[in-house]
Curated annotation (Swiss-Prot):
Its job: Plays a role in virus cell tropism, and may be required for efficient virus replication in macrophages.
GO BP of this protein: taxis
Entries under InterPro entries matching the protein: ASFV_MGF360 (IPR002595)
Name of the molecule in the record: Protein MGF 360-7L
Family indicated by similarity: Belongs to the asfivirus MGF 360 family.
TM segment ranges: none
Length: 376
């Protein structure tokens, strides 16, 4: 049962009783538990967002209701926990973050299932949050929550990360020995960039500025041109274009990432050389042509951008790699060539998408498809 005090707070907040507060009232509001972050607490029923002072629901620092609950649980703010549950926050998220026995008991009294403290439930919750793309809520629950991270079995934990990441993190952090904490953070950060979840990206970039270069690399690798443009031109985060291009080339069918690096000044012939070396490496690992279709698509796209397969360095590479008959045949027969739609270097993300869409519509790729079919 909720106290009269909690119910009174609920009514006052919902009716925006503190929207025009005086600075002298701030201490009293804090003592009464009516303060959130840097101002009087507010709640938007429509958006289910907890806000502070004059903050809007779309503000990067606004909290979804379940995130606000997790924060209140971590800070042992009893009345706020009850208040957020009244607004239908999921108390099961709270019990996962309770730091004291008293708060844990309160969560159970409010309806939390104690089974959510079991390893299996914690693991399943992680998977469910991936499906729902609740990046910030997941980070609030799992990041810096040593009890949860240590409760995961080492094999299961890394199997989950590797399955969804497909080795991606290690491709960008080969020399870094990451803790579970860092692995979890980068896992969710990558998810936000992959699906272009603007608010989580902005929130995380503000909270973890030491990962700015990593963020740009990730955006390039995944072909998120909106984030590349934002990091590069609005935040002045810069990396050498050819280095960025080498990352873009490694992600299958990454036309957006490759084009953007090309428009920034990366050498397209160097990109083609990188891809040929990669394909040769895969051939020696006995990975078939067909399973590497996405990388072959990148090769085709680089040539469409003007890369010259007849350069001395590329021809020398082809001569050395006797096993890669397909590539030699492809280049020797002249099946591929530059595409006129790609001769301009555009950096505005929406225009880049239009160019790539037009290219994909007009580029039939018949010769490449025919070659592939004849080799089956």
């Amino acid at each position: 049962m909720n106290s009269l005090q909690v119910l009174t707070k609920k009514v006052l907040i919902e009716n925006k009783a503190f929207s025009n507060y005086h600075e002298d009232d701030s201490f009293i509001l804090q003592q009464l538990g009516l303060w959130w972050e840097n101002g009087p607490i507010g709640f938007c029923k429509q958006c289910k967002m907890v806000i502070s002072g004059s903050m809007s629901c779309s503000d990067v620092d606004s909290y979804e209701l379940d995130r606000a609950l997790v924060k209140a649980v971590k800070e042992n703010q009893t009345d706020l926990i009850k208040l957020f549950v009244l607004w239908n926050a999921d108390i099961n998220y709270g019990i996962m973050c309770a730091k004291t026995e008293r708060t844990k008991v309160l969560c159970i009294q409010l309806g939390a299932n104690p089974e959510f403290l079991d390893n299996k439930k914690l693991y399943n919750m992680f998977v469910n949050l991936v499906r729902q793309q609740k990046v910030l809520l997941a980070i609030d629950i799992y990041y810096d929550n040593i009890l949860i991270l240590d409760s995961f079995g080492s094999h299961d934990f890394h199997a989950l990360i590797n399955f969804i990441y497909n080795g991606y993190i290690l491709n960008l952090d080969e020399k870094e020995k990451m803790t579970r904490n860092t692995l979890v953070l980068k896992f969710w950060y990558k998810l936000a960039i992959e699906f272009n979840l603007i608010k989580p990206i902005r929130f995380l970039s503000k909270k973890f500025p030491h990962l700015d270069d990593w963020r740009l690399k990730t955006a390039v690798y995944l072909g998120n041109v909106d984030e590349i443009h934002h990091a590069y031109f609005q935040e002045n985060i810069r990396l050498e274009p050819n280095h960025m291009m080498s990352l873009a080339c490694m992600y299958p069918q990454n036309k957006l990432g490759i084009y953007y690096c090309f428009a920034l000044g990366a050498n397209i012939n160097t990109a083609l050389e990188t891809l040929i070396r990669f394909i040769n490496h895969e051939v020696y690992r006995e990975i078939t042509f067909f399973s590497n279709y996405g990388i072959w698509s990148n090769i085709h796209f680089c040539i469409s951008l003007g890369a010259n397969p007849d350069t001395k360095k590329i021809q020398e590479t082809l001569l050395r790699e006797e096993k890669n008959v397909i590539m030699k045949l492809l280049f020797k027969k002249g099946f591929l060539g530059p595409h006129s739609i790609l001769h301009k270097k555009i950096l505005e993300p929406s225009e880049v998408r239009k160019i790539i869409s037009t290219y994909e519509y007009t580029e039939t790729f018949h010769s490449f498809s025919s070659l592939r079919d004849n080799l089956r």
